[in-house]
Regions:
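Generic structural signal for helix capping and beta-alpha/helix-loop junctions
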Residues: 29, 61, 76, 122, ...
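Bacterial carbohydrate/catabolite-sensing allosteric modules
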Residues: 1-2, 10, 14, 46, ...
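Short gly/ser/thr-rich secondary-structure transition/capping motifs
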Residues: 46-52, 119-123, 270
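Alpha-helical recognition/docking segments in bacterial nutrient-uptake
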Residues: 1-3, 65-188, 250
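N-terminal helix-turn-helix DNA-binding module of bacterial transcription factors
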Residues: 1-65, 69, 346
Length: 346
């Protein structure tokens, strides 16, 4: 009995074709007869052959990995960078992004390499990694409006796709949501419930998504005769939602409906309202944004504006794959539509 790994020759014998044909199928070369491809794939399954990724990369000139970069604009202190990484892993939104990307890449035998770019040194490391060809391109989730990484990647002409429209215009592809429409959906639902004193907990207002959600919310309320909407800015965390809701109650103690710009902050809003003896939704209706797992486990379960994060992330990966295959195309922008999901909080 031999422990030797199956080779291309073994697959060729099993399939009854030449070694060159097997190589073309394994390396994804086009214009191979579909019937021959099926024969080869069946032979691969029977023999247990595993393609050598290094050898395949020599043929395809692709690393078959992509850099998944979570970037910000913080300082270089160890404490700041550790906190940045911890926040990313604690946010269910990021987990959904990873799930969508992996769901696209895995069937294509491609893999993400997770990188964090909070400091200038981190950003330089990302640029070097890509310039060396160790990844085919970058999928960037930026967490700060002042993040310089998108502009650096565009200037270096490195294949890149962003999750969400950047705060500053750069010639890069991105996927995003119609956040303004999402804000309108939240406002219209609160009004339909009979809320007459609505307020909002926004995300960081230096981010385009936060500003757009607020604009849509305000527009819908203004059309219904509510020109002034009390607001408090949060930071997309439970604690920031608690603090923002406390400020709102100090400004508008008779508030009867709250739109929080993500589910984590909505959870914080619900917690603070309970502490103040306010019932949700009987006294104050609460709407979140994202439809993350938090929306289903919150007490009460959150009515929320669904953002199809997994689909958006998969499209992000598809755009990058297409960009690499075509060896450069003009920027593509894909906009997804939000959807209101009604549960118990509003």
């Amino acid at each position: 009995m031999t422990n030797q790994a199956p080779t291309l020759e073994d697959v060729a014998r099993e399939a009854g074709v030449s070694r060159a044909t097997v190589s073309r199928v394994v390396n994804g070369v086009r214009n191979v007869d579909p019937a021959i491809q099926k024969l080869v794939h069946r032979a691969i399954e029977r023999t247990g052959y595993a393609p050598n990724r290094a050898a395949r990369s020599l043929v395809t000139r692709r690393a078959e990995t992509v850099a998944l970069v979570v970037s910000g604009a913080g300082d270089t202190s160890r404490e700041t960078q550790d906190a940045f990484v911890a926040r990313a892993f604690a946010d269910p939104f990021f987990g959904r992004v990873v799930s969508g990307i992996v769901g696209f890449l895995r069937p294509r035998s491609m893999y993400p390499v997770l990188m964090f770019a909070e400091s200038p040194e981190d950003r330089q490391e990302v640029l070097t990694y890509l310039r060396q060809g160790r990844a085919d391109g970058a999928l960037v989730v930026s967490t700060h409006a002042d993040d310089p990484l998108p502009a650096l990647l565009a200037e270096a002409k490195l294949p890149t796709v962003l999750f969400a429209r950047p705060a500053r215009e750069v010639p890069l592809s991105y996927v995003d949501l119609d956040h303004r429409h999402g804000g309108r959906l939240a406002a219209e639902h609160l009004l339909a419930r009979g809320c007459r004193r609505p307020a909002t907990v926004t995300g960081p207002l230096d981010l385009p998504a936060s500003r757009e959600r607020l604009a849509g919310f305000r527009d819908a309320l203004a059309r219904d005769g509510h020109p002034h909407v009390p607001l408090a800015e949060g930071g997309f965390t439970v604690d920031s939602g608690i603090a923002a809701m406390e400020r709102l109650l100090a400004e508008a103690p008779d508030v009867d409906g709250v739109f929080a710009a993500n589910d984590l902050m909505a959870q914080g809003v619900c917690q603070l309202l309970r502490q103040w003896g306010r019932r949700v939704p009987e006294d104050v209706a609460v709407i979140g944004f994202d439809d993350s797992g938090v929306a289903r486990t919150c007490t009460p379960p959150l009515t929320t504006v669904r953002q199809p994060v997994e689909r958006m992330a998969a499209e992000m990966a598809r755009l990058l794959d297409e960009l690499v295959r075509r060896n450069g195309t003009g920027p593509t922008r894909v906009l997804f539509e939000p959807e209101l999901v009604v549960r118990e909080s509003a």
